[in-house]
Amino acid sequence: MLKEFKTFIARGNVIDMAVGIIVGAAFTSIVKSLVNNLINPLIGLFIGRIDLSNLVLTVGDAQFKYGSFLNAVINFLIISFVVFLMVKAINTFRKKEDKKTEAPSEEVMYLKEITELLKKNKE
């Protein structure tokens, strides 16, 4: 059972996924810092409040902390945009790879040449 587990863990997909999760977590903390320390103060300058996370709407005893929600939305938009750019770059790279592999191999070129010579000899 331990051997099977080692085989499972050693597979590329599991390792790639683990690396992706770790990098994603690190990237999320960078984006949160970007939003909290740079973007929110910039937005706060325009609306007259420096800390958006403290924006609260109080109705009776209920408090709606929409500032924290705005932070989460900004985080989501930035992360989604960066992921979109990464996927777009990967797809562009894959298309270039596909174009490279579409060129016929040397063997195929020789076979075509032989076929053409055989056709000429039959005529």
Curated annotation (Swiss-Prot):
Keywords: Cell membrane, Ion channel, Ion transport, Membrane, Transmembrane, Transmembrane helix, Transport. PROSITE patterns: MSCL. Coiled coil: none annotated. Disulfide bonds: none annotated. One of its GO terms (cellular component) is plasma membrane. It holds the Pfam family MscL. One of its GO terms (molecular function) is mechanosensitive monoatomic ion channel activity. It comes from the Bacteria. The chain crosses the membrane at residues 14-34, 67-87. It is found in: Cell membrane. It is a multi-pass membrane protein. Homopentamer. Channel that opens in response to stretch forces in the membrane lipid bilayer. May participate in the regulation of osmotic pressure changes within the cell. Belongs to the MscL family. This is Large-conductance mechanosensitive channel. It comes from Limosilactobacillus reuteri (strain DSM 20016).
